[in-house]
Amino acid sequence: MPKLKTSKAIAKRFKVSSSGKILRHKASKSHLLQKKSSKHRRHLSSTCQVDSRDAKNISINLPYL
């Protein structure tokens, strides 16, 4: 049986925490930032946990992380 391959597109977008939770960055942080308040931009900088329904599909594509 061949080795499982890591999906590089998924590997660069998600991170697995030490407790095993999958983390992601929030959207809307790349451009059109001048109309967003500083508080809103600061809030977008934080990471959040992936929904459990999506975590299963992501973990299948990240076999070694």
From Swiss-Prot:
Residue ranges that the Swiss-Prot or TrEMBL entry lists as coiled coil: none
Name of this chain's protein: Large ribosomal subunit protein bL35c
Pfam family of the protein (one): Ribosomal_L35p
GO molecular function per UniProt: structural constituent of ribosome
Keyword set, alphabetical order: Chloroplast, Plastid, Ribonucleoprotein, Ribosomal protein
SUPFAM superfamilies, alphabetized: L35p-like
Compositionally biased intervals (Basic residues): 22-44
GO BP term, pick one: translation
Gene, per the UniProt record: rpl35
